[in-house]
UniProtKB/Swiss-Prot annotation:
Name of the protein described by the UniProt record: Homeobox protein Hox-D9
Chief location: nucleus
UniProt keywords, alphabetically: Developmental protein, DNA-binding, Homeobox, Nucleus, Transcription, Transcription regulation
Chain segments carrying region Disordered: 113-196, 220-267
Residue ranges flagged as DNA-binding region: 276-335
InterPro entries (alphabetical): Abd-B_homeobox_TF, HD, HD_metazoa, Homeobox_CS, Homeodomain-like_sf, Hox9_activation_N
Length: 343
C-alpha cells in the first residue's frame, strides 16, 4: 500500500473517533457493501505496524497532492459519518408492556436525515421493539419526505413491505391499527376518562338505525312519544315532545338584523326611513264597547262626562275626544252612503 492510501485511511479513522467498532455496529447496524472501515487488527500484525511506521509527514507537498483524490474517492465512509448525527431515541417501556398500543415518542427520525423515512433499520420507535417504525413506509415511487404525521392508516392495513423490514412487518401490523386518540390518551396517563374518537358518529348511526326500525320509513327523531320508541327528541326539532320543553328564545323565530343607517347618505336613510309618529294604539274590546254605549246616549260629551269616561276606561281625555270625533265622522259617512244625492 502506498503512503497516500495509508494517509487517507488514517484521516478517515481520526474523523470517526476512538470508539470501538462494536459500539458503532450495535448502534447503527452493519455497514453497507463497499464500506471501507478500520481494519480489525490495526496494531496486531507486524505488517500493519510496519505499514504505519512507514508514514512520513515531512514532504507536505506530496501529502496534499496525493491525499485529496484518495479521500474524495470514498463516499461510503462519508455515509457512515452521517449516521453519527441520527436523532434516535430508544422505545419507551410502556410499548413492551402493552404491545397492542403505541406511544409516539417526542423525538423521532426526521424526514430530512437518511433513514428517517426508511424501512426499519433502527429508524422508528414504538411497539416494534426498535426494529422498525409502525408508520407507513414510502414506496420507491412515492414522496421522499418521510412519513406523514397525523394521517390515520386504513383499518387492518399493514405497512408496505420493503427489503429491510420484511421480518418486522408482522410485529408492527398490530400497532399500525392505532389511532391518534389512543396515543394522546397514553401520553397523558390512564387516569382520565376515555372518549373514543368516533363516538359521535356511532351514536348518530345508532339513532338513525333506531328511527329506521320504528313504525315506518317516515318516522324521524323527535316526532312524538308514540312513534320512535326510545329515540330522544333533538334540541333543534320543530315538533318537540311534551317531555322536552324548550326555552322561549328557541321557540321564537330569528329576528332579521337591523340595517345600519348611514348619516352621510340621505337617500339611503329615506329608503329605510321610519315614521316619527307614535304607533297606533287600538282600544280593547271592553273600551270600544263602553265608548259605543256612551256614543248611543250622546254623540257629544261635556268636559266633565269626558273626564269621567276617561277615568273609568283608564284612558286620557284626549283619547276619548279623538274617538268621539272619529265616530261622528264615520256615522256621517255611513249616512251619506245610505242617502245618495240623486234621491
Amino acid at each position: 500500500m502506498s503512503s497516500s492510501g495509508t494517509l487517507s485511511n488514517y484521516y478517515v479513522d481520526s474523523l470517526i473517533g476512538h470508539e470501538g467498532d462494536e459500539v458503532f455496529a450495535a448502534r447503527f447496524g452493519p455497514p453497507g457493501p463497499g464500506t471501507q472501515g478500520r481494519p480489525a487488527g490495526v496494531a496486531d500484525g507486524p505488517a500493519a505496524a510496519a505499514e504505519f511506521a512507514s508514514c512520513s509527514f515531512a514532504p507536505k507537498s506530496s501529502v496534499f497532492s496525493a491525499s485529496w483524490s484518495a479521500v474524495a474517492a470514498q463516499p461510503p465512509a462519508a455515509a457512515t459519518m452521517s449516521g453519527l448525527y441520527h436523532p434516535y431515541v430508544s422505545p419507551p417501556p410502556l410499548a413492551a408492556a402493552e404491545p397492542g398500543r403505541y406511544v409516539r415518542s417526542w423525538m423521532e427520525p426526521l424526514p430530512g436525515f437518511p433513514g428517517g423515512a426508511g424501512g426499519g433499520g433502527g429508524s422508528g420507535g414504538g411497539g416494534g421493539g426498535g426494529s422498525g417504525g409502525p408508520g407507513p413506509v414510502p414506496s420507491p415511487g412515492g414522496p421522499a419526505n418521510g412519513r406523514h404525521y397525523g394521517i390515520k392508516p386504513e383499518t387492518g392495513a399493514a405497512p408496505a413491505p420493503s427489503a429491510a423490514s420484511t421480518s418486522s412487518s408482522t410485529s408492527s401490523s398490530s400497532s399500525s391499527k392505532r389511532t391518534e386518540c389512543s396515543a394522546a390518551r397514553e401520553s397523558q396517563g390512564s387516569g382520565g376518562p376515555e372518549f373514543p374518537c368516533n363516538s359521535f358518529l356511532r351514536d348518530k348511526a345508532a339513532a338513525a338505525a333506531a328511527a329506521a326500525a320504528g313504525n315506518g320509513p317516515g318516522v324521524g327523531i323527535g316526532t312524538g312519544p308514540g312513534t320512535g320508541g326510545s329515540s330522544e327528541p333533538s334540541a333543534c326539532s320543530d315538533h318537540p315532545s311534551p317531555g322536552c320543553p324548550l326555552k322561549e328564545e328557541e321557540k321564537q323565530p330569528p329576528q332579521p338584523p337591523q340595517q345600519q343607517l348611514d348619516p352621510n347618505n340621505p337617500a339611503a336613510n329615506w329608503i329605510h326611513a321610519r315614521s316619527t309618529r307614535k304607533k297606533r294604539c287600538p282600544y280593547t274590546k271592553y273600551q270600544t264597547l263602553e265608548l259605543e254605549k256612551e256614543f248611543l246616549f250622546n254623540m257629544y260629551l261635556t268636559r266633565d262626562r269626558r273626564y269621567e269616561v276617561a277615568r273609568i276606561l283608564n284612558l286620557t281625555e284626549r283619547q276619548v275626544k279623538i274617538w268621539f270625533q272619529n265616530r261622528r265622522m264615520k256615522m256621517k259617512k255611513m249616512s251619506k252612503e245610505k242617502c245618495p244625492k240623486g234621491d
